Amino acid sequence: MIHGKTLEAWQQSHPIIAELVALKPTSWFNPGIAKAAEALHDVGLTAADVQAASARLLRFAPYLATVFPETAAAGGVIESPVIPLPQLRRVLVEEGSLQNAGSLWLKADSDLPISGSIKARGGIHEVLKHAEDLALAAGLITPTDDYTKLASDQARAFFSQYTIAVGSTGNLGLSIGIMSAKLGFQVSVHMSSDARQWKKDKLRANGVTVVEHASDYSVAVEQGRQQAASDPRCYFVDDENSPQLFLGYAVAAERLARQFDQAGIQVNADHPLFVYLPCGVGGGPGGVAFGLKLVFGDAVHCIFAEPTHSPCMLLGVYTGLHDETSVQDFGIDNITAADGLAVGRPSGFVGKAMQRLIDGYYTVADEELYRLMVIAHEQDKVKLEPSALAGVPGMLRVLQAGEYLARQGFTPTQLQQATHLVWGTGGSMVPDDEFNTYLAKGRSLQANV
């Protein structure tokens, strides 16, 4: 029995579950979405909260430019470019015989400085918020000070009295670990069995304590939570429920709007924006989607992408069970090459807060991620890790979803003028030998097609 029903009963009441359990690539577009003006109230956070996070990141920019020289050229602002993907677009259009396809772009968070993934947004913001709270309370700084003061030996000695803990499949651990250690904190990163060895090695090289767990993501998070509960000076970054992570991700939207302006890309009712966000536990894509809805309203359509073996958010929202269920409850193994998305139980906070704001969800097979990685690398010259490719098939899924397009009332002209944005969540820091192994796998899969 699964939550009081047999699997057969679930498949009858929720037919898509049969496809999920069979590990088939699946799409589901939520008929229950609402207008942004109404549904944004579900979140419990506001535009003012996002502005506060944005202002905090600017206060810390001089500090970041000082301690991370790779951010100096951008003045300590951690941001990524928007890059066209003409070859991937051509492949998707040909494969799907797509009409009125619009343009395809990459938001290259894979190239973000410091930790090379989307987690450099939320993770670094939350660590900086905690550091700021402690430093203000201790009188080390005032809000109007130059925060480069925090690069001093005195500040590092102060922060070294405190510990930060987090559970992660990899990328969040990298961003939390590197940032916390740079400030002077003691750091423990609890890593799930899915975490790549190079990510653990990089953390240890930065002076971070890595605690390895033989179980999956949810266990790693729980271990981090328990560590913090037993130590009053230990702060736990809760990837499943953190508003500060969420707000750090949300800041991306106002910056994206400026990049679109500079590139001459319009976003309005006649020029819709579709954004494809790889989803693990949900904090990163949820936060970005919240920011996008605040900035672009009903002109933006956010779609979450998950591995066929880890469809936790789709399952949670579709059944209405949210974090009360896991993919394992339904016999799905949560084992995927998309290590950053290997999450069996979704964030209840994100699922409930965002369910009326996310247009749809789809799953993608590992083999497809590898195949697309080769095209992205060889033809569009972008380096993305497997998880980051999950957003690429999104344009195909949306434009083949006739019922969804009809329900939304899109005209051929609107679709022709649409912008499709793949959120490239990570990849630049993958070691060359590991990346070449991925490419070899992708090429062998191409050869067998």
UniProtKB/Swiss-Prot annotation:
It holds the Pfam family PALP. One of its GO terms (biological process) is D-serine catabolic process. Its EC number is 4.3.1.18. GO terms for molecular function: D-serine ammonia-lyase activity; hydro-lyase activity; pyridoxal phosphate binding. The keyword Transcription does not apply. It catalyses: D-serine = pyruvate + NH4(+). The keyword Lyase applies. Keywords: Lyase, Pyridoxal phosphate. It comes from the Bacteria. Its cofactor is pyridoxal 5'-phosphate. The modification N6-(pyridoxal phosphate)lysine is found at residue 119. It is an enzyme of class 4 (lyase). Belongs to the serine/threonine dehydratase family. DsdA subfamily. HAMAP family: D_Ser_dehydrat (MF_01030). This is Probable D-serine dehydratase.
